[in-house]
Amino acid sequence: MSTTKYFEDFYLGEKFYIPAKTMTDAHFLFFAGMTGDNHPIHYDDEYAKTTRFGKRVAHGLLVASMTASGASTLSPMIEGSIVAFVEQSSRFLKPVLI
């Protein structure tokens, strides 16, 4: 069992790992249905071939949601100390190709 960590116990740049996930078309279709983001870059292979990426690209917010703290090694450390998740910022360095 991990020791409970509070806000002041963390340091900038600290890393927590999330197990690898295999995404399928079902994930992308479900996300598009839930959010209404039906841009063809996410589901149309022929359209995607005409873009600078050349392949379909995962929804940015779907990718960000896969980093949820509950799925990481952070979860057991904050279980008894977290009150609410207030904010998250993301910077996408490269596209996640489908």
Stretches found by the model and what they are:
Residues 1-58:
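Catalytic strand-loop segment that frames the active site of acyl-thioester-processing enzymes
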Residues 49-58, 62-98:
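Hydrophobic beta-strand-centered segment that forms part of the acyl-chain substrate-binding groove
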